[in-house]
């Protein structure tokens, strides 16, 4: 009896949803509908899900659209309130499990847009006491997608997601790295070391000056991101299918952008030309270019730090890097610059993502670019990777870097390029002769300068002072 009772009350595994192709069975514990299920079955390609930050951004699109349509008198209060509540649940992540689609689908993102429409409609109907799959009182197309097309909604969400994540994640993470580098700049301000150009010895500088260069690179990268993100503020919404605005009221686009700005606290606007906003993704390519330029700088910084920390006994050994974990399965006691390696691998991935974005961005055939999912995926992938890598690099590497002052001094005193300080006194050719002779004989610069009769001991000591060589003059 008990078993029979449980069988009667158990929820069926599936329910029937319909679209223009007819009925299809959908998991009963999920809010998505027929079009999402067809995409799920037709595009079993890889495991790369549509980024959840893009899904949340589409939730913002649906929320702002419902608010705008309500204000325009197109959507009644009852339906609007239910859609708005369901959209907020999408935005806050409560419904993340209901967005199963992969990146590799229609190039307009239509199936993901319909995934949002179906989930929000079913959830709204549930809130209103309706049945899942009934499409009433809230219809996924007629109400949730009102005044919209996938062709303007998806690129709008792309801009919202990228601008939001750059602002909230990447820029703050780089700010943490910048502060750590500035701290090291001050800490190392009085440590004089030999400089290197072409990987060969050059004139001295302070370790603080070297780190000031790294800090300036990060600071400039942040500044470029803040400029580039402005390119993402104009939104395609209101262009509908091809940019004409068919089926959207003339006031809709500006009203929508105002609501998005209010929701995100970012200055989004309505794009001046909707044809460009649908057919091209030039702003996306530019914005990712700024991210790629940051990766270029971080690759250089991480590479320098791991080389300066090479050793511990047979490398440059000027820096002592934090020891976070064992480095070898065969060599006992070995510790590797793993944070530098992770950072440079992330940078390589970002460079690859930029190539994909550049190629995809060039594919705006006629009135619509149909490579939008791969554009969004690579952009958001880069932002996430760069932000995470910057935080990891800061916490587990940069903040714990120490200088081996004894090793730094030893290498500096052995450098032949200190001879540069003699050039104004004895001339370039004679200074070069001192350096070459000292190198050939295995002697010091001072010994050869005195032997050749170019300067006295007092003159050499007065002219060759590494700490004075770190400043103009």
Swiss-Prot record:
Q: What class of enzyme is it?
A: lyase
Where is this chain primarily localised?
cytoplasm
Which Gene3D superfamilies is this protein grouped with?
Fumarase/aspartase (C-terminal domain) (1.10.40.30), Fumarase/aspartase (Central domain) (1.20.200.10), Fumarase/aspartase (N-terminal domain) (1.10.275.10)
Please state where this protein is localized. Cytoplasm
Q: Where does substrate bind?
A: 108-110, 139-142, 149-151, 197, 329, 334-336
First and last residue of the signal peptide: none
The Gene Ontology biological process annotation of the record reads: fumarate metabolic process; malate metabolic process; tricarboxylic acid cycle
Cite the InterPro entries for this sequence: Fum_hydII, Fumarase/histidase_N, Fumarase_C_C, Fumarate_lyase_CS, Fumarate_lyase_fam, Fumarate_lyase_N, L-Aspartase-like
Tell whether Lyase is among the UniProt keywords: yes
**Molecular function terms, GO-annotated:** fumarate hydratase activity
* EC number, as in UniProt: 4.2.1.2
Return the similarity comment.
Answer: Belongs to the class-II fumarase/aspartase family. Fumarase subfamily.
The name on file for this protein is Fumarate hydratase class II 2
């Amino acid at each position: 009896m008990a078993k029979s009772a449980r069988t009667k009350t158990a929820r069926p595994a599936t329910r029937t949803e319909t679209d223009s192709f007819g009925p299809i069975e959908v998991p009963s514990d999920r809010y998505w509908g027929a079009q999402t299920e067809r995409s799920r079955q037709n595009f079993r390609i890889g495991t790369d899900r549509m980024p959840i930050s893009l899904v949340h951004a589409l939730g913002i699109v649906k929320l702002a659209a419902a608010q705008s349509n309500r204000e325009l008198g197109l959507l009644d209060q009852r339906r609007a309130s239910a859609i708005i509540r369901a959209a907020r649940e999408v935005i806050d992540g409560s419904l993340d499990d209901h967005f199963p689609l992969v990146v590799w689908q229609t190039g307009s993102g239509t199936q993901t847009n319909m995934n949002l429409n179906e989930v929000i409609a079913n959830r709204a109907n549930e809130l209103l006491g309706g049945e899942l799959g009934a499409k009433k009182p809230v219809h996924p197309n007629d109400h949730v997608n009102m005044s919209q097309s996938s062709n303007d909604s998806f690129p709008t969400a792309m801009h919202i997601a990228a601008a939001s994540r750059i602002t909230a994640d990447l820029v703050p993470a780089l700010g943490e790295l910048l502060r750590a580098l500035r701290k090291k700049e001050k800490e190392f301000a009085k440590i004089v070391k030999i400089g290197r150009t072409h990987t060969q010895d050059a004139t001295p500088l302070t370790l603080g000056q070297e780190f000031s260069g790294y800090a300036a690179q990060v600071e400039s990268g942040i500044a470029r991101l803040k400029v580039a993100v402005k390119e993402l503020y104009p939104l395609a919404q209101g262009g509908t299918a091809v940019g004409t605005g068919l089926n959207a009221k003339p006031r809709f686009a500006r009203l929508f952008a105002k609501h998005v700005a209010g929701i995100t606290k970012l200055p989004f606007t309505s794009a001046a030309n909707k044809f460009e906003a649908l057919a091209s993704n030039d702003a996306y390519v530019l914005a990712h270019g700024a991210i790629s330029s940051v990766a270029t700088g971080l690759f250089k910084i991480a590479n320098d730090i791991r080389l300066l920390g090479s050793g511990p006994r047979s490398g440059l050994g000027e820096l002592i890097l934090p020891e976070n974990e064992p480095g070898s399965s065969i060599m006992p006691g070995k510790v590797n610059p793993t944070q530098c390696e992770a950072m440079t691998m992330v940078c390589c991935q970002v460079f690859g993502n930029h190539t994909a974005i550049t190629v995809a961005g060039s594919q705006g055939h006629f009135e619509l670019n149909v490579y939008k999912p791969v554009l969004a995926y690579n952009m958001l992938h880069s932002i996430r990777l760069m932000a995470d890598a910057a935080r990891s690099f800061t916490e587990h590497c940069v903040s714990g870097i120490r200088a081996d002052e004894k090793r730094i001094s030893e290498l500096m005193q052995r450098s032949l390029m200190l001879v540069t300080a003699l050039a104004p006194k004895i001339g370039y050719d004679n200074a070069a002769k001192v350096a070459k002779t000292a190198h050939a004989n295995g002697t010091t610069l001072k010994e050869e300068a005195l032997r050749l009769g170019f300067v006295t001991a007092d003159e050499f000591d007065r002219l060759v002072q590494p700490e004075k060589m770190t400043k103009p003059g």
